[in-house]
Swiss-Prot record:
Subcellular location per the Swiss-Prot or TrEMBL entry: Nucleus
Protein name: Azaphilone cluster-specific transcription factor azaR
DNA-binding residue intervals: 27-53
InterPro entries recorded: TF_fung, Transcription_factor_dom_fun, Zn2-C6_fun-type_DNA-bd_sf, Zn2Cys6_DnaBD
PROSITE patterns per UniProt: ZN2_CY6_FUNGAL_1, ZN2_CY6_FUNGAL_2
Protein's job: Transcription factor that regulates the expression of the gene cluster that mediates the biosynthesis of azaphilones, a class of fungal metabolites characterized by a highly oxygenated pyrano-quinone bicyclic core and exhibiting a broad range of bioactivities.
Any one biological process term the GO annotation gives: positive regulation of metabolic process
UniProt region (Disordered), positions on chain: 1-25
Coiled-coil ranges (or none): none
Record keywords, A-Z: DNA-binding, Metal-binding, Nucleus, Transcription, Transcription regulation, Zinc
Pfam families found in the cross-reference section: Fungal_trans (PF04082), Zn_clus (PF00172)
Keyword Transcription regulation applies: yes
Native organism: Aspergillus niger (strain ATCC 1015 / CBS 113.46 / FGSC A1144 / LSHB Ac4 / NCTC 3858a / NRRL 328 / USDA 3528.7)
Taxonomic classification: Eukaryota, Fungi, Dikarya, Ascomycota, Pezizomycotina
Length: 465
């Protein structure tokens, strides 16, 4: 009787104990920082840190993926059968153990299925790579909204385009991290296989998706950093052609162009903004590469695409209507301040004009035309570039040093100054014009020194460590 009362008392005590965790799921920021989350719509930890609170309610189930154990059993059965046949002398051609193993594994695995590194990498590492991307890569490649990505990244069923984008995000995140060299190569190979398989699908022409362009942008950057310049150049060319194929620069051609987005109003503007940012990131990549290569641009500045809004409003979900590039260049858009991304676009545009100036000058020299038009165009580009460099960076030095996009924008502007001087050196000028060349040479030397300083400062950012 006494034992019964004791048991009852223990059960009552257990029932009255409160759980250490409140109802609901912890937000992504608290999971990353390993803090106890109060599980409110905007938790106190995120409020104190000044970040947007994101809670992922669709976490994948633990354990092996569906069909994984069945595939392993099939491989084991194939190996056992091959070993029995070899023992009984049924194999006509003698083969080595390695060849036997390769044959058995290839027989049990479908050739069309790409290797998935997530089967070998733990879920915690993959989630860490997502966090690394938004902390170290997103400031330099601001094409994704964090909340929208995490809302679909953990869905059990994803489209092929989104799967390729997620793999590209994790590949580039591993590329900027020095702690996962063994994961980096496997992720890269799998991502390229996924993206190349998308291009072999005829549905690309009828069901285009800009997320495939985003994935190729990230892979091109990874290849410039980790593989080779030529491989990155080829992938960048894919980006430019896909942008043209999907007609992304016409996203703001008319108000009706946004009505084809079959989304709720809260998500529609985010998708439209991501498309704009995808177009402009491809445009900056085009200008930057050709400034080095002295080639011709694939994408033009006449894009019917609004400039990207400031990063803080984009990430926090506060839409702002921005103007067009032509208005910003003319100085007529005073409705909203330009973001560092938009300033980078402006300087890339003016510096990109030196490329067409170079080709026009060469053509006029070959035709024997007078150089007055060349000199007038040269002075106009130089004046415009100098004015925008001074206007875009009338900021405290601390503001520049904390924003990698601003530093990169200034580097593109200095590259335009060097490109102008390179054109001067290859052009036979009239005697009255030669007297101005020392001034341009001094500006070019100053631009070269400034570029070296900017490159050193850029190395201190986490994405380049």
């Amino acid at each position: 009787m006494s034992d019964s009362r004791t048991t009852t008392t223990k059960n009552n005590t257990t029932n009255h104990k409160t759980s250490r965790q409140g109802p609901g799921s912890a937000c992504e920021e608290c999971r990353r920082r390993k803090l106890r989350c109060d599980r409110q719509p905007q938790c106190q930890n995120c409020v104190d840190a000044g970040v947007y609170c994101v809670t992922n309610l669709a976490r994948p189930a633990r354990g092996p993926k569906k069909g994984h154990l069945k595939a392993l059993k099939g491989r084991i059965a194939t190996l056992e059968r091959c070993l029995l046949e070899q023992r009984d002398g049924m194999l006509v051609d003698p083969i080595s153990d390695d060849e036997l193993l390769d044959k058995a594994l290839s027989a049990s695995s479908p050739a069309s299925q790409s290797p998935d590194p997530s089967e070998e990498v733990s879920e915690n590492i993959l989630e860490d790579l997502d966090q690394v991307f938004f902390e170290r890569v997103q400031p330099m490649v601001p094409i994704l909204q964090r909340h929208r990505y995490f809302s679909w990244a953990r869905e059990p069923q994803q489209s092929a385009n989104r799967r390729g984008l997620q793999q590209a995000i994790r590949t580039l995140a591993a590329g900027v991290s020095s702690q996962l060299p063994e994961v980096r190569v496997a992720l890269y190979r799998t991502t390229r296989h996924t993206l190349e398989s998308l291009e072999s699908d005829d549905t690309l022409l009828t069901a285009p998706d800009f997320e495939q362009v985003q994935a190729w942008i990230l892979i091109a950057i990874y290849e410039f950093m980790q593989v080779s310049y030529s491989r990155g150049w080829m992938s960048a060319g894919r980006v430019f052609r896909l942008v043209q194929l999907l007609r992304l620069p016409e996203i703001d051609a008319s108000p009706l162009s946004l009505l084809d987005l079959d989304l709720d109003p809260d998500s529609k503007w985010v998708v439209a903004e991501e498309k704009r940012r995808t177009v402009w990131m491809a445009y900056i990549m085009d200008c930057s590469l050709n400034l080095r290569h002295k080639g011709s641009l694939t994408l033009t500045e006449q894009a019917l695409t609004r400039l990207p809004m400031p990063e803080s409003e984009f990430q926090c979900g506060h839409p702002i209507s921005m103007g067009f590039l032509a208005e910003a260049l003319a100085g007529t858009d005073i409705t909203s301040p330009l973001s560092s991304f938009a300033k980078c676009i402006l300087l890339a545009t003016i510096s990109g004009r030196t490329l067409s100036h170079r080709h026009l000058s060469m053509a006029e020299l070959l035709r024997g035309n007078p150089l007055q038009d060349v000199w007038t165009r040269h002075q106009w580009i130089d004046t415009t570039l100098t004015a925008h460099l001074q206007l875009s960076f009338s900021l405290p030095t601390a503001a520049e040093s904390s924003d990698p996009m601003l530093l990169f924008a200034k580097m593109i502007g200095q590259a335009g100054v060097l490109s102008l001087y390179d054109i001067l050196q290859s052009t036979p000028w009239e005697p009255e014009t030669v007297s101005l060349l020392p001034d341009y040479e001094a500006c070019a030397l100053q631009a070269a020194r400034e570029t070296v300083v900017l490159a050193r400062n850029l190395r201190h950012f986490s994405c380049f460590k």
